[in-house]
């Protein structure tokens, strides 16, 4: 067992794109961070770092969980600030990829590094052992590589690369810190060029480039084939290259060429002529507005190699190839791809074949197990399955035979043989007992490090199954289960975890059972999102059938469910990750506490579909404003903070931002590793139960802003209407939201109860739902997934 590294203060060396974002994410996690760079030649000595910190607020996606956190980063420079390193527990070096520069910096900082501090390089592929050569003996056992993927806030992967002398306890402590505090998925890589993620990921891009030209396909065509159709991100191959930067791409390819002279695929480790030509022209990708793709007005154009010019990006996957990719059985799908004569199908088979070949050939050199390769590619490149999982799913023995045939027929990119272990009678590399390690010639289980006990359901590999727990109650909407302890868990079974009648009735039943047989209850979903809100299709069906009474009963049942959660006699904890919209947001607002993963996107978005929150959300906003204002206080001032959030259907860009928007409470917990959220939510439920939890007393004296509050909000809305920031229908919806949160047309400071506010919610919700424009908004959202502004 190893304790997590205790990091009171951290330093990041290098305020470039990566260094600044690593500093931002450490700050997100509550780590006091100093960001270093060279002293500026003009202006303040810390000018380079100050500019980098200011730039964090402009980057998209946002590196900071809240723009306000930028002020928490301390700027420093290597001339006057090195004394600050003495009280840093972790130092991450993230300067340019030059061995000599990095080693010079290490020599400079070594005298200032504390005796207990860990020094780690964020190099994306330079030799860790060689970097450590210049370190004093007493620091070498505390040095390793830790390679974050860009953007570090969002990419789950962190590669941990030990040097020969790195202390095991140092590695385990750093691993635990990376997993829990920074929320990362850690993979150990061997000290080989580009480690695991970029070694396999960049090879996949190089093989795609090779086969694009071999089969005469367009860049847009290939992106259509190598994105979601094969379980990879929308940006696919060439769009990703534009986002990364074509100059960066060329640099990574050159590094592979320079550092892997003996790789049997070495002849492909060079930039193609077309890439060099684009770079020479300054078309470096997204950062300069032109690369392989370019936007012209509203149109996207793409480089055409034959024409040596841009053309409309209008080529897509052929219908017959799409049909093959839709086949559910992977073995049948790969057989069809291989036998098809269509160049797109041939391209896909060739790309997968060479990826499998390369991954198997190099597995023993770069990683301990096949698990490390698959997780590195999934977490670092956003693929739904890693290369070995894909191969195993398609039928290990058959695919191995096909690869061997293609090698002997000279069709593969390299004539290097597949390793012997591929043909030892195995059906794959992953199984219930673990993942294959060529070094041990055995399947190795997952890490037994204590930190992983916090993950009840880790990210599963193909063939891995985790016990689903013992079912207590189940209907068409929810499943309630437990692990033999006193905290029950309830998960939804609907698409996108939307809230249907079955979910509402199920939750009420579940709360009752939890009160009777358990000490607490956690609302947690097996997969994101937490909940995309109410089942709009079902609601629209009732309205179009003219069943207004049934519709109103549905709303009343929604409110009753929220109230049941709030006033449960055991603590109900919501474990939120991903989207928590509409009713999903309202359920967590009514929980005793919310445990929200950093990447939680929370919002009361009903205005976007022509409605207002009516699952108790507006009532809860009014209650919280009354409590915050205190007896005789200014309720309107408190309401103002949240009103715009709801009226404009704002969604938080992080859990931290959700607190700023008033959608999470200050006491709610932000979790950095979503795989730990169930563990933490159960711990919170247990702590409340052990502390003698009682539900809050019913709110019977809620101070409201009344008619004066409504009038003031309407004045603000008129200004927005006249400035054309909102439509007339937006104005009507927002006015009704104002009416509910202000408690209706009563005197300012009047006291009302929860039932009064819930009635107001229901009344305005049902009236809006019957409007043509609202039904048009709902229909448009169901059809397109986008809001209609009418």
Predicted feature descriptions by range:
Residues 586:
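Short alpha-helical segment that forms part of, or immediately flanks, the ligand-binding pocket
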């Amino acid at each position: 067992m190893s304790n997590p590294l205790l990091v009171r203060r951290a330093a990041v060396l290098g305020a470039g794109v990566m260094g600044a974002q690593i500093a931002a994410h450490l700050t997100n996690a509550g780590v006091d961070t100093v960001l270093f760079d060279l002293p500026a030649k003009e202006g303040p000595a810390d000018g380079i770092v100050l500019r980098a910190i200011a730039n964090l607020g402009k980057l998209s996606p946002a590196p900071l969980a809240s723009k306000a956190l930028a002020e928490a980063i301390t700027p420093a420079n290597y001339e006057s600030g090195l004394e600050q390193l003495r009280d840093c527990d972790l130092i991450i070096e993230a300067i340019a990829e030059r061995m000599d520069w990095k080693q010079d910096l290490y020599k400079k900082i070594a005298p200032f590094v504390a005796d207990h501090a860990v020094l780690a390089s964020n190099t994306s592929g330079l030799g860790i052992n060689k970097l450590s050569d210049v370190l004093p003996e007493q620091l070498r056992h505390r040095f390793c590589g830790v390679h974050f993927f860009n953007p570090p806030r969002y990419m789950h992967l962190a590669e941990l690369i030990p040097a020969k002398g790195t202390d095991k306890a140092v590695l385990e402590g750093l691993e635990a810190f990376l997993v829990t505090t920074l929320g990362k998925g850690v993979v150990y890589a061997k000290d080989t060029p580009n480690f695991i993620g970029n070694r396999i990921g960049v090879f996949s891009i190089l093989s795609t480039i090779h086969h694009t030209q071999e089969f005469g396909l367009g860049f847009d065509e290939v992106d259509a084939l190598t994105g979601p159709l094969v379980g990879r991100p929308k940006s696919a191959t060439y769009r990703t290259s534009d986002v990364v930067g074509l100059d960066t791409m060329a640099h990574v390819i050159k590094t592979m060429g320079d550092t892997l002279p003996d790789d049997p695929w070495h002849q492909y480790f060079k930039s193609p002529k077309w890439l060099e030509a684009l770079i020479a022209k300054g078309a470096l990708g997204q950062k300069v507005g032109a690369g392989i793709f370019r936007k012209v007005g509203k149109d996207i154009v793409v480089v055409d190699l034959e024409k040596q010019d841009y053309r409309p990006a209008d080529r897509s996957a052929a219908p017959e190839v799409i049909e093959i990719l839709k086949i559910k059985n992977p073995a049948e799908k790969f057989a069809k791809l291989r036998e098809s004569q269509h160049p797109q199908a041939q391209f896909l088979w060739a790309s997968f074949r060479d990826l499998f070949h390369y991954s198997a050939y190099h597995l023993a050199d770069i990683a301990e197990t096949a698990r490390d390769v698959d997780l590195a590619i999934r977490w670092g490149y956003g693929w739904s399955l890693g290369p070995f999982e894909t191969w195993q799913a398609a039928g290990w023995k058959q695919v191995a035979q096909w690869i061997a045939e293609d090698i002997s027929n000279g069709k593969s990119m390299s004539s290097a043989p597949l390793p012997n272990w591929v043909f030892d009678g195995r059906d794959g590399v992953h199984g219930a007992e673990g993942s294959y390690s060529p070094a041990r010639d055995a399947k190795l289980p997952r890490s037994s490090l204590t930190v992983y006990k916090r993950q009840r359901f880790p990210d599963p590999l193909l063939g891995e199954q985790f016990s689903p727990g013992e079912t207590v109650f189940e209907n068409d909407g929810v499943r309630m289960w437990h692990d033999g302890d006193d905290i029950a868990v309830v998960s939804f079974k609907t698409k996108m975890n939307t809230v249907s009648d079955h979910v509402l009735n199920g939750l009420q039943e579940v709360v009752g059972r939890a009160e009777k047989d358990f000490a607490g209850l956690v609302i947690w979903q097996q997969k994101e999102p937490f909940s995309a809100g109410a089942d709009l299709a079902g609601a629209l069906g009732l309205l179009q059938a003219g069943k207004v009474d049934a519709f109103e009963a549905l709303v009343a049942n929604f409110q009753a469910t929220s109230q049941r959660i709030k006033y449960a006699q055991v603590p109900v904890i919501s474990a939120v990750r991903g989207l928590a919209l509409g009713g999903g947001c309202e359920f967590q607002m009514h929980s005793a506490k919310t445990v929200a993963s950093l990447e939680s996107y929370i919002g009361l978005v009903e205005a976007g579909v022509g409605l207002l929150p009516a699952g108790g959300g507006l009532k809860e906003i009014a209650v919280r404003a009354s409590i915050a204002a205190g007896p005789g206080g200014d309720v309107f001032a408190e309401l103002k903070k949240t009103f715009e959030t709801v009226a404009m259907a704002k969604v938080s860009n992080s859990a931290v931002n959700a607190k700023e928007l008033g959608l999470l409470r200050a006491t709610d917990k932000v979790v950095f590793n979503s795989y730990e959220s169930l563990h933490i939510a159960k711990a919170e439920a247990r702590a409340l139960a052990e502390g003698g939890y009682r539900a809050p007393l019913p709110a019977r004296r809620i101070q409201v802003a009344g008619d004066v509050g409504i009038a003031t909000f309407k004045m603000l809305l008129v200004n927005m209407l006249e400035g054309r920031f909102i439509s007339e229908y937006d104005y009507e919806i927002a006015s009704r939201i104002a009416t509910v949160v202000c408690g209706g047309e009563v005197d300012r400071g009047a006291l009302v109860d929860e039932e009064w506010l819930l009635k107001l919610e229901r009344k305005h919700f049902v009236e809006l739902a019957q409007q043509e424009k609202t039904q048009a908004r709902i229909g448009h959202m169901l059809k397109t997934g986008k809001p209609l502004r009418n």
